[in-house]
Every structure is written in structure tokens, then in C-alpha cells.
Amino acid sequence: MRFPVWTLVICASAVLIFNSPELRTLLIYDRAAITHGELWRLVTGNLVHLSNTHLAYDLVAFLIAGTIIEIRCYRFFPTLCLSAAILIGIILYGVEPGMYFYAGLSGVVTAAITYLCLHGLTEKGMWRWLCAAMLAGVIAKIGIELMLDQSFLLSVGTEEFVPVPLSHLIGTVTAILLFLMSLSASLEHPKNAL
């Protein structure tokens, strides 16, 4: 069993940034600032949160998924988080020219949950079935969000912020790609199993 270092570092960073207006201003995804060369915002915007509710939703889900991933020693978790953050920022910048600001960890959270579920599908017993059900839920949630063009949580009236369903899809695709690459590597080199 491993201590969830990366999970706690990412959560602590999000809390620190939330409690510092200066850091929020410096790190939020801001299209105009990115266009003028502040490229770090493509990644760091994922750590910025705009309300207590926004932060709480993301932290609870990330703490649970990340802790389980790290305790179960599923490999490449830091790579997953960084890859998802980078791809979310770059893709949103490329395909959402009308989006001037973006903040939140939900796309990375979705990547973590998807990654956890995919690993769980390789195991036996009840855990496998629980992961299959969670993965089906993630896919259904993203489908609903994309059809309604809003977050599932917003459709039940509980959000104070504007969600970006595309970030959840990007997170899921990132998790699937990294999982398949790690699976392929473990098949080529059995000593480096997942």
C-alpha cells in the first residue's frame, strides 16, 4: 500500500490557489493572457476554482479516485494528471475560441475516475463489477452533458458555476489512451505489469 502523495499534493495546490486571489488571477485559464504568451495557464487553469461548491465537488471526487489509484499502486497517475491537464487546456484553446476563461479540476477528476475504472476491469471479483458500473456511469454522464450542453449536476440545479462538458470528454479520452499505452507496454514487458 502506498501513501497518496500525488493526490494530496494536487488537492493541497487547489486549496492554496483557491485561498489566494493573486494566485487565482495568475494561474486561471485566460485566453487573452495565453494568446500573449502566458502558456502555463493552459495547464494551471485546472487547479483554479471559482467557488466553495466548485472546489468541494472537485476535491471530494479527486481525493477518492486519486487515493484509490495510489493505494492500489496503479502506475502512471502523475502522468495521467499532467497529460489530462495539458490536453484539456490545449484542446479547449483550439476548439472553444469563445471561451475566455476556464477553471476547475473536473476534467482531470474524470480522467482519474476513468483510469481507476479501467484498471479495475482488469481485476477479479466485486471490484471489477463496481468499476464496470462506475465506468458506465461516467460514459452516461458525459453523454448527457454533451447532449444537454451542460453539466449533469447543473441539470439537477445544484451548481454555481458554468461547467465545460468537453473537458470531461477530454479527460476520459486521455485516461483511455494512457491505459491502453500502459497495457501495451505491460504486454511487451511482463515484468512491468500494470
What are these regions, as identified by a protein language model?
Residues R2-V9, F76-A84, W129, A133, ...:
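Alpha-helical transmembrane segments of integral membrane proteins
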Residues V15, G66-T67, G89-G94, L116, ...:
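Alpha-helical transmembrane segments of multipass membrane proteins
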Residues V9-I10, D58-L63, T110-L118, S167-S182:
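Hydrophobic cores of alpha-helical transmembrane segments in multi-pass inner/ER membrane proteins
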Residues V43, H54, G107, K141, ...:
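Divalent metal-coordination and catalytic microenvironments
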Residues A140, E145-L194:
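C-terminal transmembrane module of polytopic alpha-helical membrane proteins
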Residues L8-S83, I90, G94-A103, G157-P163:
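N-terminal TM1-TM2 helical hairpin plus the immediately adjacent luminal interfacial "cap"
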Residues I90-L118, T122:
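Membrane-proximal helix-loop-helix units in multi-pass membrane proteins
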